[in-house]
Amino acid sequence: MTRVQFKHHHHPD
């Protein structure tokens, strides 16, 4: 569940 947080930090849709 850490990958989801990383993606959100990259570009939060």
Swiss-Prot record:
Taxonomic source organism: Shigella flexneri
Sequence similarity: Belongs to the HisL family.
Top-level taxon of origin: Bacteria
Name this protein carries in UniProt: his operon leader peptide
Keyword Lipid metabolism belongs to the record: no
Function: This protein is involved in the attenuation mechanism for the control of the expression of the his operon structural genes.
Coiled coil: none
A Pfam cross-reference name: His_leader
Keywords, alphabetical: Amino-acid biosynthesis, Histidine biosynthesis, Leader peptide
GO biological process: L-histidine biosynthetic process
The keyword Transmembrane helix belongs to this UniProt entry's keyword annotation: no
InterPro entries (alphabetical): His_leader (IPR012565)
